[in-house]
UniProtKB/Swiss-Prot annotation:
Protein keywords: Oxidoreductase
Domain of life: Bacteria
This protein's name: Probable glycine dehydrogenase (decarboxylating) subunit 1
EC number(s) from the headed UniProt entry: 1.4.4.2
NCBIfam families the UniProt entry points to: PRK00451.1
Gene Ontology terms, MF aspect: glycine dehydrogenase (decarboxylating) activity
SUPFAM superfamilies noted in UniProt: PLP-dependent transferases
Family: Belongs to the GcvP family. N-terminal subunit subfamily.
Protein source organism: Desulfotalea psychrophila (strain LSv54 / DSM 12343)
GO BP term, example: nucleoside metabolic process
PANTHER family xrefs: GLYCINE CLEAVAGE SYSTEM P-PROTEIN, GLYCINE DEHYDROGENASE (DECARBOXYLATING)
Reactions this protein catalyses: N(6)-[(R)-lipoyl]-L-lysyl-[glycine-cleavage complex H protein] + glycine + H(+) = N(6)-[(R)-S(8)-aminomethyldihydrolipoyl]-L-lysyl-[glycine-cleavage complex H protein] + CO2
Subunit structure: The glycine cleavage system is composed of four proteins: P, T, L and H. In this organism, the P 'protein' is a heterodimer of two subunits.
Function: The glycine cleavage system catalyzes the degradation of glycine. The P protein binds the alpha-amino group of glycine through its pyridoxal phosphate cofactor; CO(2) is released and the remaining methylamine moiety is then transferred to the lipoamide cofactor of the H protein.
Length: 450
């Protein structure tokens, strides 16, 4: 819709209709001290040519992955996107489709989402998967709310301090105006969640553990599940790197009741951090409390296989006060992209890619340790890891930017007690020669300090 400002004649005509002589007369009920005085500092209009030049100048300030080597993950990972994905997803049948309310004219969209659910359920080892949330953070927050619906009178959720800080912030935002309570569980010397205090928490509805966690450490999900169930709480397993489960035992196999996390690694670009795709699944017995939509398989009147929305507990389907979620249609395109990615690689491809990521991170870690870096934690890691250096790495990090290398995320901003610690990540997009060159540059800049 275009915005065309009113002409003076139109303004006068409207004032006459409402019986006012001027705009000041129209807004006389607003005290003079509350009105903005002076001109609004809006620049003059630009021609089309000038506008294109203006945006070109703004775009030139951007820094993109293709021009840099980025050794940072922390919830947003640089993975190769097969060319078949943008080709398929650009088809108007998928790209412009809205909520498939009429299954008779939306079988393609519904089947695409159904296949996403099936592949995600296999990856995560769970019974049922919904048609996606906004991102990993909202999926975790919705999982916490889901656990409260199931546990009824219990009002507390325990979150591991090793869960992505942004995820924990979103959960806190969801719960801040409620009577629900969040308790943070500490991290032990190995970088894993310390569950020793669970028995002393009253009204515990659920416990959320991320694996691999924010530090890249692989949690003992099997052991966590047993301890959580021992205190009669629901086990929420979350993740920020879905690819890890191409190599690791799935959360469902480890006893997780609710599984949630970020699927950005599966065919979605980083794009300033979004859009993501919130993966979410649960056990069959909990499915009626799961938010969002589920696409189900059925038979039509002629006995042919078809797909329909089922258990659609969104506020636009049922009464708002009974709804479990208000996640909207735009996530369907992201879910379908993730489904196409999994179908393109297949189980073997995802497993091989996960192994490649593990090996790249292990090689980078070993090379940095040779420079004197000390691992923050000794537990097994996937894709990323935390280190401390015997020299001023912040200065080295700034110098590397001049070489188009973005290396290491300072953990101090998220964990003040981890001053001088940095989080690194390596994926399949980082070649061995890239790693060797970057390590040599770090060594060169570190020696300049001595």
């Amino acid at each position: 819709m275009r915005y065309l400002p009113h002409t003076e004649e139109e303004i006068q005509e409207m004032l006459e209709v409402v019986g006012k002589e001027s705009l000041d007369d129209l807004f006389s009920s607003v005290p003079a001290e509350c009105r903005y005085q002076g001109d609004i500092p809006i620049p003059a209009a630009l021609t089309e040519w000038q506008l294109k030049d203006h945006f070109a100048a703004l775009m030139s300030k951007n820094r993109v992955n293709q021009e840099h080597k980025v050794l940072i993950g922390a919830g947003s990972y640089d993975h190769y996107v097969p060319e078949i994905l943008p080709s398929l997803m650009s088809r108007s049948e998928f790209l412009t489709a809205y909520t498939p309310y009429q299954p008779e004219v939306a079988q393609g969209t519904l089947q695409g989402i159904f296949e996403y659910q099936t592949l995600t359920a296999r990856l995560l080892g769970t019974d049922a998967v919904n048609a996606s949330m906004y991102d990993g953070a909202s999926a975790l927050a919705e999982s916490a709310l889901m656990s409260f619906r199931i546990a009824r009178k219990k009002k507390t959720v325990a979150l591991s301090a090793a869960i992505h800080p942004h995820y924990r912030e979103v959960v806190a935002t969801y719960l801040q105006a409620t009577d629900f309570t969040i308790i943070e569980l500490p991290v032990d010397a190995e970088g894993r969640t310390d569950l020793s205090s669970l028995a002393g928490i009253e009204g515990l509805a659920s416990v959320a553990i991320q694996s691999p966690n924010f530090f890249g450490v692989v949690e003992d999900l099997q052991g966590c599940g047993e301890k959580i169930h021992d205190v009669d709480a629901l086990f929420i397993s979350c993740f920020s790197e879905a690819l890890a489960y191409g190599l690791l035992k799935s959360p469902g196999e480890c006893g997780a009741d609710i599984i949630c996390g970020e699927g950005q690694s599966f065919g979605l670009g980083r794009s300033y951090g979004g859009p993501g795709v919130g993966m979410m699944g649960c056990r069959d017995k909990l499915v009626r409390n799961m938010p969002g939509r589920i696409v189900g398989q059925t038979l039509d009147t002629k006995g042919k296989r078809g797909f329909v929305l089922t258990l659609a507990t969104r506020e636009q389907h049922i009464r708002r006060e009974k709804a479990t979620s208000n996640i909207c249609s735009n996530q369907g395109i992201c879910a379908m992209t993730a489904g196409m990615y999994m179908a393109t690689l297949g189980g073997t491809g995802i497993r091989q890619l996960a192994r490649l990521n593990y090996d790249k991170a292990a090689y980078l870690r070993s090379e940095l340790i040779k420079l004197g870096a000390k691992p923050l934690f000794d537990a097994p890691v996937f894709n990323e890891f935390a280190l401390r250096f015997p020299f001023d790495f912040e200065r080295v990090r700034e110098a590397l930017k001049e070489e188009s290398v973005v290396a290491g995320l300072s953990l101090e901003a998220y964990y003040p007690d981890l001053q001088g610690a940095y989080l690194f990540c390596a994926t399949e997009t980082l070649k061995k020669e890239d790693i060797d060159r970057i390590v040599s540059s770090i060594k060169k800049h570190a020696l300049q300090e001595v």
